[in-house]
A protein has these predicted regions:
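Bacterial N-terminal signal peptides
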Residues: 9-19
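Bacterial N-terminal signal peptides that target proteins for export
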Residues: 1-10
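Feature marking well-ordered beta-strand scaffolds used for ligand recognition
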Residues: 255, 272-683
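Extracytoplasmic soluble-region selector
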Residues: 24-300
Length: 683
């Protein structure tokens, strides 16, 4: 049954709103050129500068028209008469006249270059380094800080020494001590210098012992931790003796021509490829080594296609699978640019996915759907409502086969809800990418604003809550962690308290999934990028003349009907100590880009857009690139010849549930698959 819910006050507001733009669009044909207030913009990161554009006719007179002004998301913020620089780089603001629907005229347009610069450097700090012994090398590091207190990422430092006879320093801060004496090491960046003074003494080490070598073979991807123990002539351990680590590789049969074979970080080693690996520790004139074999991880499982709920009318967005209050299993999917449709399925039998209902609300897109853990309510996000008060729609799921609208809620979230997170009593909803609002839904017919969290100078895409901590994915800011009930930092749903944040090198944090790993006692954060282009790469995507991946093929123009192209990967942070998070691993497929994810039972279920659904073994300590370690368990790239875009994979969201894996594909709808048990070889 398809049901349509219209909210009449919104329709009257729509008429009042569009009257002025429609009148302005009628003037579009008078415009001959656009005149910007400045020909180009230069902005210091975090600052804003005035920027306006006027439309004029052939005589130079102003024309009242509606303009579309766009810039790169997350890099520039374009407001009412101002532009704010969010990330340093060179960008372009594009401006065009909005023409009436159906017009074939090319609208006047212009492009304005924008350069966002870093604030000036205020200080350089050399981090504490170990004692310098003659005959050893110690790598130094330094950080540069801007006048606003922020750190400059990856500063190109210049290193220098006061006495090359005592110690030299390379371009990367590696200080090699040659003789006893005093030496000053300097680090400079953009005219600011810092220094550290070393007293070089004789190396007292007499013996080096290497501990931690495995007794037998290991698997690729297993982390092996070594310890180097340096002793002096009396047998006492030298705690501050600098140790350098190296790794060698001997190919076994069939393994010639392999890429990087492993990764070494201090005393930790992980093999990427099978073969004989050798780890060597060196301290001054002393060295010790250990050799061992790494065998294939051998985790591949067959994946069986169980069921498919085709959706070819609209582009499918996110999914949520849950057990209803009647004990049966259900799925909800959203849709993009559909006029506000959500779809409801009975998935109790995953091989017979059955659409049982649809619901249309006042929205252009339903990007996200959620249900409470107890199945009491569901919620639909809204973007593009006719009255520009987007908010969300809360559904009473007392009868899961007949969802009822319990409430429309928009307090504090009128500017567009892109993502949400549902708990039994609280609902977390994004507000126009600026903040998230916490709503008391104890009574779903009377939801109440409780509190909100808005991280300074940051834009967010998603929020996920686990064990009283809210993890918001905030693009260049990275992941922001807030206490909303954990209590260790004094937070609660009514009083969110900031805990920490962690920025990734790519600056495109789109989704976060926290995971506690029982075997190691570690808590990992899986941070997913979203980068909707491949500019600058060898495979850069399809030409613009082909149209948009979002459109079905148009035989008249020959455009549309092709897959999207993306990039980006999963970055894995050890969050066991929240005050000291550390990036330790990644899962990167170079040809594709990541979207939503789920982690459960030592498996990563990754929606990899055009790379399909990918299931990855994340057992044991994690280090290096999981993709090159043979940790992929299964991959499936769904296609449908009758999909919204035929035979074009675009996996959006995934969720394991009761032994099956459900996922949504933008072009083909809802799918269910199952990992089959590994078969023992027949001898």
């Amino acid at each position: 049954m398809k049901r349509h819910f219209f909210f009449w006050p919104a329709l009257f507001l729509l008429i009042a709103f569009v009257t002025a733009p429609l009148a302005a669009q009628q003037n579009a044909g008078l415009v001959t050129r656009l005149v910007p207030s400045v020909a180009q913009l230069t902005i210091v990161r975090g600052d804003e500068t005035p920027f306006t554009v006027q439309a004029v006719d052939a005589s130079g007179a102003l024309v009242h028209v509606e303009l579309r002004i766009t810039g790169p998301r997350g890099l520039l913020q374009i407001g009412d008469g101002v532009v704010t620089g969010l990330e340093p780089g060179e960008y372009t603001i594009n401006v065009s006249v909005v023409v009436p629907a159906g017009s074939t005229a090319t609208p006047p347009s212009l492009s304005v270059p924008v350069v966002v610069t870093w604030p000036a450097v205020d200080r350089v700090v050399i981090l504490h380094a170990a004692t310098l012994y003659a005959g050893t090398t110690v790598t130094h590091s330094a950080r540069a800080f801007n006048v606003d207190g922020s750190a400059r990422p990856d500063p190109d430092l210049t290193w220098a020494t006061s006495d090359a006879a005592v110690a030299t320093v390379d371009a990367f801060g590696g200080v090699s001590a040659h003789a006893e004496g005093t030496v000053t090491i300097r680090a400079s960046f953009e005219g600011v210098t810092s220094q550290i003074v070393h007293g070089v003494v004789a190396f007292p080490g007499a013996a080096l012992e290497l501990r931690g070598a495995p007794d037998g073979s290991v698997r690729t991807g297993d982390v092996v931790r070594f310890e180097a123990v340096v002793r002096d002539a009396s047998g006492a351990i030298l705690e501050d003796a600098p140790v350098n680590w190296s790794h060698g590789y001997t190919a076994t049969a069939g393994m010639l021509g392999v890429p990087a074979t492993g990764q070494m970080k201090q005393g930790a080693f992980v093999a990427d490829v099978p073969g004989i690996h050798t780890v060597t520790a060196t301290a001054g004139p002393l060295s010790a080594r250990a050799s061992f074999e790494a065998k294939p991880r051998d985790v591949v499982q067959e994946l069986e296609i169980v069921g498919h709920g085709l959706e070819d009318w609209y582009r499918t967005t996110d999914i949520w699978i849950f057990e209803g209050v009647d004990g049966r299993d259900y799925a909800i999917t959203g849709s993009k640019v559909s006029g506000g449709f959500a779809f409801f399925y009975d998935v109790t039998d995953p091989s017979a996915i059955t659409k049982i209902d649809s619901l249309q609300v006042d929205a252009r897109t339903i990007n996200d759907v959620k249900a409470s853990p107890d199945g009491r309510y569901a919620v639909l996000s809204r973007e593009g409502a006719t009255n520009r008060r987007d908010g969300l729609v809360i559904l009473d799921m007392a009868d899961p086969r007949n969802p009822r609208v319990a409430a429309l809620y928009d307090e504090g979230i009128t500017g567009g809800v892109h993502n949400m997170f549902a708990e039994n009593d609280y609902l977390y909803a994004l507000s126009n990418g600026d903040k998230y609002v916490i709503i008391d839904v104890t009574d779903i017919y009377n939801p109440k604003y409780l509190s909100e969290y808005n991280h300074p100078d940051s834009r967010l895409h998603d929020v996920w809550v686990q064990n009283g901590l809210a993890y918001s994915s905030e693009w260049g800011t990275g992941v922001v962690v807030v206490d909303v009930g954990d209590g260790r930092w004094g937070g609660s749903p009514a009083n969110p308290v900031f805990v920490t944040s962690y920025a990734t090198p790519t600056g495109r944090t789109h989704a976060t999934f926290p995971y506690y790993q029982e075997s190691t006692g570690k808590t990992y954060l899986f941070l997913g990028d979203e980068i909707m282009n491949r500019r600058g790469l060898a495979w850069a995507g399809y030409p613009r003349s082909w149209g948009s991946y979002q459109n079905q093929y148009d035989p008249e123009t020959g455009t549309g009907g092709f897959p999207l192209v993306t990039r980006g990967f999963i970055q894995i942070v050890d969050f066991t100590q929240p005050e000291n998070p550390e990036m330790v691993a990644r899962y990167e497929m170079p040809e594709f880009g990541t979207h939503n994810l789920w982690v459960e039972d030592d498996k990563l279920y990754q929606s990899y857009y055009e790379g399909g659904l990918r299931v990855v073994d994340i057992s044991g300590e994690l280090m290096g690139n999981l993709y090159t370690q043979g940790r992929e368990i299964a991959v499936f790239k769904p296609v449908s010849p009758v999909g919204y875009v035929a035979n074009a994979t675009m996996v959006w969201g995934t969720q394991p549930f009761k032994g099956h894996v459900f996922f949504s594909d933008t072009n083909s709808g809802l799918w269910s698959v199952k990992l089959l048990p590994r078969r023992r070889p027949i001898s």
